[in-house]
Amino acid sequence: MSVLSVYHESRPEQPLKVLTHLEDIAATLAEVGVQLERWDASAPVAAGASQEDVIAAYRPQIDRLMAERGYVTVDVISVSRDHPQKDELRAKFLDEHRHAEDEVRFFVAGRGLFTLHIEDMVYAVLCEKNDLISVPAGTRHWFDMGEQPSFVAIRLFNNPDGWTAQFTGERIADQFPRLDD
């Protein structure tokens, strides 16, 4: 079940609200330009699946997104509990950063916590299988896959070079709850 916890940036210990209904979550995020949709992720894939297998399994959904929204590059992030670089990947994504393009993720297995820092508010979005999240270019955010990650997400880009982050250097992510908290 997707969950949205909304905080003021100065009060990481106490959310202002916690939402669990998709319609409420999507409406709240839409107010700040973020899209959250429920898509069908019924093709069986597991954390650790190869990029080729995941893309092949979800080719119709990928083609639809690329055609509708003009994305030019697709890849897959697939991290399991036994991934040899899970700690390094987690550390990299946990630092607040932004991108020059929209960040689009379609979760086809597992879950992860996308936390968005918009003006003086923090939106922690627990994304799970079937969730498609689209974060506007320039939005400060971080992502937590957890200490024992298990997720597969399809990533779509306008930039042919793929994932390129601009780290803010801010330590705000350290103050807010993580996926395992």
Curated annotation (Swiss-Prot):
This protein's name: Acireductone dioxygenase
InterPro entries: ARD (IPR004313), ARD_bac (IPR023956), RmlC-like_jellyroll (IPR014710), RmlC_Cupin_sf (IPR011051)
Site feature (May play a role in transmitting local conformational changes) residues: 102
Its EC number(s): 1.13.11.54, 1.13.11.53
Disulfide feature: none
Residue numbers marked as site, May play a role in metal incorporation in vivo: 96
Protein role: Catalyzes 2 different reactions between oxygen and the acireductone 1,2-dihydroxy-3-keto-5-methylthiopentene (DHK-MTPene) depending upon the metal bound in the active site. Fe-containing acireductone dioxygenase (Fe-ARD) produces formate and 2-keto-4-methylthiobutyrate (KMTB), the alpha-ketoacid precursor of methionine in the methionine recycle pathway. Ni-containing acireductone dioxygenase (Ni-ARD) produces methylthiopropionate, carbon monoxide and formate, and does not lie on the methionine recycle pathway.
UniProt similarity note: Belongs to the acireductone dioxygenase (ARD) family.
GO molecular function: acireductone dioxygenase (Ni2+-requiring) activity; acireductone dioxygenase [iron(II)-requiring] activity; iron ion binding; nickel cation binding
Sequence positions that bind Ni(2+): 97, 99, 103, 141
Gene name in the database record: mtnD
Keywords: Amino-acid biosynthesis, Dioxygenase, Iron, Metal-binding, Methionine biosynthesis, Nickel, Oxidoreductase
Cofactor note: Binds 1 Fe(2+) cation per monomer.
Recorded coiled-coil stretches: none
Pathway: Amino-acid biosynthesis; L-methionine biosynthesis via salvage pathway; L-methionine from S-methyl-5-thio-alpha-D-ribose 1-phosphate: step 5/6
Cofactor section: Fe(2+); Ni(2+)
GO biological process: L-methionine salvage from methylthioadenosine; L-methionine salvage from S-adenosylmethionine
Quaternary structure note: Monomer.
Binding site for Fe(2+): 97, 99, 103, 141
UniProt source species: Stutzerimonas stutzeri (strain A1501) (Pseudomonas stutzeri)
Important to generate the dianion (site feature) positions: 105
